[in-house]
């Protein structure tokens, strides 16, 4: 219980665990990033911080910030959807999310894009998840980068991806690039 309790936007009854959907999609994170951070808009509109990584020049690597340690995928997805809608931008992953249709009980959350921490949970359970996906006729998670809904706090042009097979975090993938995405929901 309380597996997703750090995401204050999730309905109270959806704090027990996460479900990975059977199919996957792909697309860009956002077609527009010159206007600034989604995070600036999100915080100004009452959402929790949507960043997840920063670049550590001394270590030549991307490092998780304090928000990357929280399960904030639902919060970040709702913020990205609001930002995209208000500014009339396009987002391949939001369009795919809107188009993705599954039957699910009313007592679960809407579908959303995982944050860094949620993708790390998927990575830590990928063997069981892939076996379950395969048994249910779904597509298994691949050895490739998957979008998270976490921004890079030092570059509005970048968002984080995680490889669910290796756990490898890339904090600086261009938002205009195409990558895979696997939606989840909370119960």
Show which residues each predicted segment covers:
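Short, compositionally biased
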Residues: 1-107, 174-187
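Ser/Thr/Gly/Pro-rich, low-complexity flexible regions
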Residues: 39, 67, 76-77, 112, ...
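C-terminal, surface-exposed recognition/capping segments
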Residues: 98-100, 109-110, 116-187
């Amino acid at each position: 219980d309380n597996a997703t309790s750090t995401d204050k936007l999730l309905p109270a009854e959806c704090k027990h665990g996460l479900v990975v959907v059977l199919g996957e999609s792909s697309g860009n994170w956002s077609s527009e990033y010159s206007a600034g951070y989604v995070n600036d808009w999100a915080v100004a509109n009452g959402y929790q911080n949507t960043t997840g990584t920063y670049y550590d020049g001394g270590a030549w690597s991307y490092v998780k910030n304090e928000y990357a340690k929280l399960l904030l995928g639902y919060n970040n997805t709702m913020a990205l959807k609001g930002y995209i809608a208000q500014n009339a931008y396009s987002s391949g992953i939001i369009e795919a999310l809107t188009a993705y249709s599954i039957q699910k009980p009313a007592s679960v959350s809407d579908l959303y894009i995982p944050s860094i921490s949620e993708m790390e949970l998927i990575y830590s359970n990928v063997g069981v998840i892939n076996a379950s996906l395969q048994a249910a006729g779904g597509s298994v998670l691949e050895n490739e980068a998957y979008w998270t809904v976490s921004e890079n706090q030092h570059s509005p042009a970048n968002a984080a991806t995680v490889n669910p097979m290796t756990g490898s975090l890339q904090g600086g993938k261009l938002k205009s690039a195409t990558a895979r995405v696997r939606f989840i929901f909370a119960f």
